[in-house]
């Protein structure tokens, strides 16, 4: 199942203003909400709520404003709290719906001096550390399973099965050809990402392999030459980490999806 919860650090401004409204006894009548909206215009420009006022859909109308700042019940979960919640509910974590923001292999952290230290951590601690580093996540969305469900969902590029994976582009994936970093023939991004450092440069041979993805052919069919196999493995694992593709891992069973 797909499960979404609020995250605490990116919503710090909401909780500050919620406490502010509670102290003033601000209610949910139309005049009170209008006065609240007008008062928010006086917020300091560096207030933690300002990025959400600019970007979050919750603040585009008075009803959304009231729901965000005056809702009596709201629970946010850090990564460790979310994973503990899953365990207590008899659920098992599968993957983040958009995982790149949680991975030290992706974005600015990939070239950080701390990347090797992060990679030494167990996976769950890695996610928690990257959440703290980014500091502005407003929600966590994950694919989860019942704890007793068969564990057939872990994707692995370390064995011999990956050449049989069928890559499928995600609908928010786009190829960009403007303002490229040195040596790149294109950059692939996922439009649903909110962090601007999460993009994957492609060299010309990688771009050719990426453009061959059609949702029908396996990696081995896209990169049939032996010399292409290792570069293809690196590329397609990177595309998966960066939320650019998913895989049909059952091509021998009729490639069902």
Predicted regions mapped to residue ranges:
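Phosphate-handling architecture centered on phosphoinositide signaling
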Residues: 10
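Long, charge-rich, low-complexity alpha-helical segments
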Residues: 104-145, 195-257
